[in-house]
Amino acid sequence: MPEPLPLFPLNTPLVPGLVLPLNIFEPRYRAMVQELLDEPRDEAREFGVIAIREGRDPLREGTEALYAVGVSALLRQAEELEDGRFEIVTTGHRRFRLISVEPVPTGAAGAHSGDVTPADPDHDAGLASPAPLLRAQVEFLAEATSESDALLADQVAARFREYRSALGGQVQATVGEDEIPHDPTVLSYLVTAAMVVPQQERQQLLSADSTAARLTIARGMLSRETVLISELSAVPSLDIPGATPSVN
């Protein structure tokens, strides 16, 4: 059986290719970062980022409190501060499906980045000992592709340009108008990260079982949102995740 993947629950899903900086301050997650830094191989410095269902507590409810599909994050940079916190930079790597979750006692706990907050930031306040680190058995998911992906990608890219124009630049993305990726899978994840939609819909995109399915869902969402913004002046008021979409 593979080694359990340490989990870092957040209030929004990560996607593959997304650059996610984090300020690690809770003891359990500081210990997790140190554990990753002790790994001699860069590719082994991996932990799981998964979104928590609204109003749920993953420590008490386990998998029931978490969405089924998350994304592993690779630790790219880490700086330990004088007070013991870590400033780290991670990149979304590969999707996984939760099989089981177990709280493992540790001397470490949490982090946040901008609008992205830990799933249970106040949980440690009333505990006599540090909250445990969640570790999960997971199944890593392959990304199915098909011949229809290229056509769908062209359609989604066109709708994404219209959507960004309607929003008036509110979509955070590091790619310019003429730099939208041609790779269908990369495009599907860029749109997943950049759209201003509720968490459940972003999770639906992430959980799609193929690039074609994700692009098809994204195409519909982009069309819907562009109409709402353009015709009803209904600009979304949702916060955009405090992370940087990357086409790498």
What is the meaning of each model-derived region?
Residues M1-N248:
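N-terminal low-complexity, acidic/polar interaction/targeting segments
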